[in-house]
């Protein structure tokens, strides 16, 4: 699933490698081709150019490894992206499910001075509206870091219910970048109350995870966009395994 409006190929590739690392997925050229819907030869040519530019190197196992410069640039573009998402939700009040695609445009044009103003304006957030850590904050403000906000280890919903004898109570912690470009899916998650900070009950079903609980309010406070039974109880939602694997939770 790719976002529309990405205008810088180098930054797009750097951010994709950064995303894969966050998800614990080995960054290979094949994974980039899948994520960005590009052909193998196109990806190989771009990776070769980035290697010549000193942004990454290809290890013996074909894994892509960012150089120090490449990691610095990848961190910056992801920081801009997630700060833009925070602004779009909190100030501009764009619907939660739409902010990722819009932020994909902003991340390539935002200056560091604007980043700092947004960061201070919003009260120094350390996570985006999807629960992901905003990286590289120490570059904006000396001594600042998001490292300490990883309080409890989290895991994909699919792992949380694996080998479980019954339902699992958990808190939604984050939704990975990979699924955020799918507006229909993100709206489904919001309507089911599957958003960061929400308590849910998880059960294994064939081919995926059934999610109970959630909340009658989404992250942007819009109760009308949440599916309830008329009594304020959110209807359960069945997530396919390939979606549930990108929704992380912390077990209670």
Sequence positions of predicted segments:
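Extreme N-terminal segment that seeds HTH/winged-HTH DNA-binding domains in transcriptional regulators
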Residues: 1-37
């Amino acid at each position: 699933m790719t976002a529309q409006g990405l205008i810088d190929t180098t930054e797009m590739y750097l951010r994709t490698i950064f995303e894969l690392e966050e998800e614990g997925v080995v960054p290979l050229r094949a994974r980039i081709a899948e994520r960005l819907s590009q052909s193998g030869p196109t990806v190989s040519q771009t990776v070769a150019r980035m290697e010549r530019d000193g942004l990454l190197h290809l290890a013996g196992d074909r894994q892509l490894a960012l150089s120090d410069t490449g990691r610095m640039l990848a961190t910056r573009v992801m920081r801009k992206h997630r700060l833009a998402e925070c602004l779009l939700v909190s100030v501009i009040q764009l619907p939660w499910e739409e902010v990722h695609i819009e932020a994909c445009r902003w991340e390539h044009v935002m200056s560091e001075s604007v980043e700092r103003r947004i960061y201070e304006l919003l009260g120094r957030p350390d996570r985006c509206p999807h629960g992901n850590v905003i990286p590289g904050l120490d570059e904006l403000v000396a001594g600042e870091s998001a490292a300490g906000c990883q309080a409890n280890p989290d895991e994909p919903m699919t792992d949380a219910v694996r080998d479980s004898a019954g339902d699992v109570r958990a808190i939604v912690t984050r939704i990975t970048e990979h699924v955020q470009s799918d507006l229909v899916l993100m709206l489904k998650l919001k309507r089911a109350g599957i958003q960061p900070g929400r308590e849910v009950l998880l059960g294994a079903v064939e081919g995926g995870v059934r999610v109970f609980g959630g909340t009658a309010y989404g992250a942007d406070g819009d109760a009308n966009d949440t599916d309830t039974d008329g009594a304020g109880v959110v209807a359960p939602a069945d997530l396919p395994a390939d979606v549930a694997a990108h929704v992380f939770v912390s077990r209670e």
